[in-house]
Amino acid sequence: MVPFVRMLALAAALLAAPALGFAADATTVSPKGQKLAQELDSMGVESKWIAGAHIDWETGLPDGRPERMPGRHTHCSAFVAAFAKKLGIYVLRPPEHGQVLLANAQNEWLAGDGAAAGWRPVASALEAQTLANSGVLVLASYHNHRDDKPGHIAIVRPAATTPEAIAAVGPMVIQAGSVNSASIPAKDGFAGHVHAWRDNEIDYYAHEIAGE
């Protein structure tokens, strides 16, 4: 989504969204946040959803089919969709949309139809980390300026940090990508997209986890 249109859509969604409850700050991880972190780590993202492999989107394991996409096709959006499904939460995924350019499509879906599925925009990186620390599922999403080029999406992982660190390098995320990581600052995780961190074009969306 182009930056100006993206800002208008986010502002409208923020005005319409009900408030999410969260802990006081981003410096501590609540018991619910600790549970969320354990569930994220159980996905084994650093050994699954590997770039360049043709995978089953839900398991992250190679499906035996040759990868025909040019370059090293990455699976950030498949990992996010798989984890959300594990929690019983819907985010745009196959078969409603194929894996190719899914991150861009998820960004558009979150800003539009995602509200009806329980997703709410988050105003800042600091709030995104705070929500994750309280046990809320939070996504960090970037739409490429070109519709025919991939965007990126990651999950904000619970982590004890500081407002100063978040301002400098962003919230901590877990992601599949060119390099998969269970814990990496958003600034580094989105480094392959020059506009994402530099131009403040990462969108954050939150969804309460049932039973939490």
Regions found by a protein language model. Name each.
Residues 1-9:
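Bacterial N-terminal signal peptides that target proteins for export
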Residues 9-18:
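Bacterial N-terminal signal peptides
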Residues 19-23:
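Sec/Tat signal peptide C-region and signal peptidase I cleavage site
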Residues 24-103:
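N-terminal capping segments
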Residues 89-92, 156-162, 207:
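Short regulatory "switch" loops immediately downstream of catalytic or recognition motifs
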Residues 97-179:
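...with weaker cross-activation on analogous glycine-rich loops/strands in unrelated enzymes
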Residues 169-212:
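Low-complexity, Gly/Ser/Thr/Pro-rich intrinsically disordered linker/tail segments
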